């Protein structure tokens, strides 16, 4: 058994995403454009594009929007030339935070990210200052009540590296990030549909925040996630709701 209330955390995350669907779509369109520009418009030969298109489907984005984003990326149209920049920093108590961005203006983005860190009690670090505390992996989360034995057998056969049952009964499956699409397809073919399936930066160790510290940490994370140029925010902080 391992982990905190992963199920509660993911339900909260999904609810927040639903509330910001327009913003989620904007981020996905940027990611689809960049993936298509870098690797071509065929999802079968471009794993990054396929992942972005799958996320768009999960977010109920219309297929026409997806196609237009792919076409813009492949065609190199205005707006497709975003630069990928990763920022690293610390929240209160030294919590590790990674901020991945896609931007057409590096100066604007770094200023906005730095301002969010400083306004809410954190500070930016140098490249590599916290990334070593995370693993780049494919992650799947299955609802409590899923058959652990059957899922473990299917996951390991699919090429997963690890299967963990959390304290709340949810089950987490981890794989190499390069194998994400293959493992996802195999699990779904075996009848297992994950509530969460993503390529992520998973913290090697987590730090709980409660009370006032939890409120402060959540404000910092929200401020970063609400920046237009930010695509993903990863942290080893766990905000515990009381």
From Swiss-Prot:
Gene3D superfamilies: 1.10.10.200, 3.30.70.980
Species of the source: Burkholderia mallei (strain ATCC 23344)
Name of this protein: Probable transcriptional regulatory protein BMA1884
InterPro entries per UniProt: Integrase-like_N, TACO1_YebC-like_2nd/3rd_dom, TACO1_YebC_N, Transcrip_reg_TACO1-like, Transcrip_reg_TACO1-like_dom3, YebC-like
Main location: cytoplasm
Similarity comment text for this entry: Belongs to the TACO1 family.
MF GO annotations: DNA binding
GO annotation terms (biological process): regulation of DNA-templated transcription
Keywords for this protein: Cytoplasm, DNA-binding, Transcription, Transcription regulation
HAMAP family: Transcrip_reg_TACO1 (MF_00693)
Location within or outside the cell: Cytoplasm
GO cellular component: cytosol
Top-rank lineage group of the source organism: Bacteria
């Amino acid at each position: 058994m391992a982990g905190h209330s992963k199920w509660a955390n993911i339900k909260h995350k999904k609810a927040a995403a639903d509330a910001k669907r327009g913003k989620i779509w904007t981020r996905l369109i940027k990611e689809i454009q960049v993936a298509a520009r870098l690797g071509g418009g065929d999802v079968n030969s471009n794993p990054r594009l396929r992942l972005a298109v799958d996320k768009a489907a999960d977010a109920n984005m219309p297929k026409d929007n997806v196609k237009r984003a792919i076409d813009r990326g492949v065609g190199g149209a205005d707006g497709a030339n975003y630069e990928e920049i990763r920022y690293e920093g610390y929240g209160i108590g030294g919590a590790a935070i990674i901020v991945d961005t896609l931007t057409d203006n590096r100066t604007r983005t770094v200023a906005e990210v730095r301002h969010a860190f400083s306004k809410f009690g954190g500070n930016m670090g140098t490249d590599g200052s916290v990334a070593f505390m995370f693993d780049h992996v494919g992650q799947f989360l299955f609802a409590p009540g899923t058959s652990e034995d059957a899922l473990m057998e299917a996951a390991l056969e699919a090429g997963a590296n690890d299967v963990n049952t959390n304290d709340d009964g949810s089950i987490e499956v981890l794989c190499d990030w390069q194998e994400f699409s293959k493992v996802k397809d195999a699990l779904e073919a075996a009848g297992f549909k994950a509530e969460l399936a993503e390529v992520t930066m998973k913290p090697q160790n987590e730090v709980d925040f409660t009370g006032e510290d939890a409120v402060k940490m959540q404000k910092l994370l929200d401020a970063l996630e609400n920046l237009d140029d930010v695509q993903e925010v990863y942290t080893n902080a766990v905000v515990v709701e009381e």
